[in-house]
């Protein structure tokens, strides 16, 4: 229950920050005020604030309080951040999502696929091509590979919605960490066919390997983004030895 409580407070504060209720550089209410507002313990508030710090929304200032350091992105961009489903990312960016499944099939990883994805050769996989729309524009082409023995009974219909919702809510899988590589690559014929690149001849590519709580890599995804709508946001902390 405490975990759900701090997570709910985190979501509420994050929404207030993203919608501008707390303006850029504004101080958040004091710890005591937040305790009264959310009827919770001091530790619960501190856990919620720590999560906001880790995600780059706020900065704690000793003796002063907590300052909002989040500046909303322009609506013409699509910002990616933590481990999120496309649906979650779209809603966080205040945009309307739609997903079209172009291909849904079952494959066995050969050496070429193994080298590309990191799955061992011989792994049984779902391979999915999905075209993601935001506010009616086709912006992202995803190539997804999921381990069949983890994403059990995955279907095209589920892929049209949210695969992560299915994994977490139906299969009770904990999605823990993701390794990402971002590159700029020349467009392919498939990119040109679906993404309406216009005068662009390249796009932003995010390749990710995602792991569950058992340390098993269950997903490899290559997301190919229209460059005029792509924005990556990270939170970096300088650590002194």
Map each language-model feature to its residues.
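Beta-hairpin "wing" of winged helix-turn-helix
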Residues: 54-63, 69
